[in-house]
């Protein structure tokens, strides 16, 4: 299911011949599924178990963000947004699932820049908080990295399993099946069918938001 979502997200983002109707239909389906998922399962976040339990949520959310990064202009409907995508993202980023933390970092950072520029949702305060939490976690592990009797019990094996599972989860989120292959002849054949990031990125790639620049200065 995760791989299928990655293929859908990458294809909808990159395929040049798709109509607006087709793109909005897929986005509408994803937003409906994600909204329902949050309503039904958000309380489970407070229960025991790793966040990889919700990998289908993160794969679907990341696919939608990836689509939005490439197709955000098509989501505009006058003064409003198709699928009420602005209200949707505003709800999702503050959910207990915290997708800005657990989805692919590069995709989330680019989504945050575009979403802020388009007035959809502001993400950088949450990203900063996530980074601070991660830093505190790393420092805490360094302080507690001392021999103890607990290291010989099942606790260490549980922790090791969690680390392995988390790495597999992160690796899975980093798969983009329709990322470009730099083959000159093939590229000429595909230019009428394939959207390069440079076709839609504008200044987003080179000009990070002022907020993010300030955030980096403080870290």
Tell me the role of every PLM-derived stretch.
Residues 1-219:
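Eukaryotic scaffolding regions of large macromolecular assemblies
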């Amino acid at each position: 299911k995760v791989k299928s979502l990655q293929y859908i997200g990458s294809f909808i983002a990159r395929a040049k011949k798709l109509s607006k109707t087709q793109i909005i239909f897929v986005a509408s389906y994803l937003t409906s599924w994600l909204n329902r998922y949050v309503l039904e399962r958000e309380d489970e976040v407070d229960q025991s178990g790793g966040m990889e339990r919700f990998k289908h949520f993160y794969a679907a959310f990341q696919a939608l963000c990836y689509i939005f990064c490439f197709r955000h202009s098509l989501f505009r409907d006058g003064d409003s947004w198709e699928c009420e995508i602005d209200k949707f993202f505003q709800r999702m980023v503050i959910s207990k699932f915290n997708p800005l933390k657990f989805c692919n970092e590069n995709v989330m950072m680019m989504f945050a820049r575009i979403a802020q520029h388009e007035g959809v949702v502001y993400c950088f305060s949450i990203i900063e908080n996530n980074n601070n939490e991660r830093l505190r976690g790393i420092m805490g592990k360094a302080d507690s990295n001392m021999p103890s009797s607990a290291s010989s019990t099942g606790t260490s094996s549980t922790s090791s399993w969690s680390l392995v599972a988390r790495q597999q989860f992160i690796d899975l989120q980093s798969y983009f099946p329709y990322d470009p292959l730099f083959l000159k002849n093939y590229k000429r054949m595909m230019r009428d069918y394939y959207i390069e990031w440079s076709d839609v990125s504008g200044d987003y790639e080179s000009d990070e938001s002022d907020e993010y620049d300030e955030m980096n200065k403080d870290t």
